[in-house]
Amino acid sequence: MITALTALLVLISLGLIVTVPVALATPGEWENSKSDFTKGFQAWVALVLVIAAADGVASSL
């Protein structure tokens, strides 16, 4: 399970690495899609916390 969550984290990270600079470089794109990127950032942070919690539980067993 932790491996799948880590793979999802890597995919979200790669998506943000590619799309955020493109949105910032395109005139007006950041303002239009700012809420979508905010949701992506929130999902990334939440996934980091879930992976940390899952790893903590798995290592204590």
Swiss-Prot record:
The keyword Ubl conjugation does not apply. InterPro entries: PSII_PsbZ (IPR002644), PSII_PsbZ_sf (IPR036512). Keywords: Chloroplast, Membrane, Photosynthesis, Photosystem II, Plastid, Reaction center, Thylakoid, Transmembrane, Transmembrane helix. It holds the Pfam family Ycf9. Gene3D superfamilies: Photosystem II PsbZ, reaction centre (1.10.287.740). It is found in: Plastid, Chloroplast thylakoid membrane. The chain crosses the membrane at residues 5-25, 38-58. GO terms for biological process: photosynthesis; photosystem II stabilization. GO terms for cellular component: chloroplast thylakoid membrane; photosystem II reaction center. It is a multi-pass membrane protein. May control the interaction of photosystem II (PSII) cores with the light-harvesting antenna, regulates electron flow through the 2 photosystem reaction centers. PSII is a light-driven water plastoquinone oxidoreductase, using light energy to abstract electrons from H(2)O, generating a proton gradient subsequently used for ATP formation. Belongs to the PsbZ family. PSII is composed of 1 copy each of membrane proteins PsbA, PsbB, PsbC, PsbD, PsbE, PsbF, PsbH, PsbI, PsbJ, PsbK, PsbL, PsbM, PsbT, PsbX, PsbY, PsbZ, Psb30/Ycf12, at least 3 peripheral proteins of the oxygen-evolving complex and a large number of cofactors. It forms dimeric complexes. This is Photosystem II reaction center protein Z.
